[in-house]
Amino acid sequence: MAKLLVKQVRSKINCPLDQKRGLEALGLRKMGQVVEHDSNPTILGMINKVKHLVSVEEAK
């Protein structure tokens, strides 16, 4: 299973509550924070919901 690096690049201020909770579920609390996750349907769905707030790269 591929690993993904997810980085928060935009602020969650003025975002709907479900998007804020999506960022928290991904483990992102601050701008510029990077977390690593497995690429599975659950994580991909969370990333899709906040795709305008994060950048995603495949881990090496």
Curated annotation (Swiss-Prot):
Stored Pfam families: Ribosomal_L30
Gene Ontology cellular-component annotations: cytosolic large ribosomal subunit
Highest taxon of the lineage: Bacteria
Gene Ontology molecular function, alphabetical: structural constituent of ribosome
An individual GO BP term: translation
Keywords of this entry: Ribonucleoprotein, Ribosomal protein
CDD domains assigned to the protein according to its UniProt record, in alphabetical order: Ribosomal_L30
Membrane-traversing stretches: none
InterPro entries per UniProt: Ribo_uL30_ferredoxin-like_sf (IPR036919), Ribosomal_uL30_bac-type (IPR005996), Ribosomal_uL30_ferredoxin-like (IPR016082)
NCBIfam families: rpmD_bact (TIGR01308)
Subunit structure of this chain's protein: Part of the 50S ribosomal subunit.
Family as reported in the entry's similarity comment: Belongs to the universal ribosomal protein uL30 family.
Protein name per the record: Large ribosomal subunit protein uL30
